[in-house]
């Protein structure tokens, strides 16, 4: 994806739009849900950047300004992990703030192996290890999305009771 907009568009199409459609159909699409999913879409932006590392030569040849081309590999790899980690940490603290401590703790536990995989695979060589990193880390991010959805469902049910 080219630049910030392309990566964010990709991340939001995978995360925010399906969640919003589901909430609009089966629940209630509230500002809180929109904020949580926009945050996870920023994590999705980071995931989209991971895919750009393997295309650096082609992007340069075609004049595409993917983040690794625009910022260089060193800066782009830190932008990548920063967006993925910071947004999930913010969501975990948000869940704690609304009283969903159990789910917040679950999310913290799911973030830890992602950070481990970042230091083991991605940060040393994002071009060579992108697939290893995604295989090791992505399932934990997806389970984090699930935990956040369950937390929100629990929170809404507790408010309704």
Where do the PLM segments sit?
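Multi-pass alpha-helical membrane architecture of UbiA-family
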Residues: 1-161
